[in-house]
């Protein structure tokens, strides 16, 4: 299921770095994580949906690149974000 505008707004409110922030790496990564989790649930039910699986892999790659960027730019923000999102167990 696609992300609703309301849910997206909640994520932006939770992870924004400053007022009117929609494009910071933290917000982008949080939105991608939510989309990835939703798509994972879809793929558990629809195992043969290879088209969506490819989209999932693209999202994971994009999130990975954004995480690498944030880690190189500011390690403290990176660590705080992965703690909040529960990534890298």
Curated annotation (Swiss-Prot):
GO terms for MF: rRNA binding; structural constituent of ribosome
Keywords: Ribonucleoprotein, Ribosomal protein, RNA-binding, rRNA-binding
InterPro entries: Ribosomal_uS15, Ribosomal_uS15_bac-type, uS15_NS1_RNA-bd_sf
GO cellular component, as recorded: cytosolic small ribosomal subunit
One GO term of the biological process aspect: translation
Record HAMAP family: Ribosomal_uS15_B
Family: Belongs to the universal ribosomal protein uS15 family.
Protein's job: One of the primary rRNA binding proteins, it binds directly to 16S rRNA where it helps nucleate assembly of the platform of the 30S subunit by binding and bridging several RNA helices of the 16S rRNA.
Subunit annotation: Part of the 30S ribosomal subunit. Forms a bridge to the 50S subunit in the 70S ribosome, contacting the 23S rRNA.
The protein, known as: Small ribosomal subunit protein uS15
The organism of origin for this protein: Geobacillus thermodenitrificans (strain NG80-2)
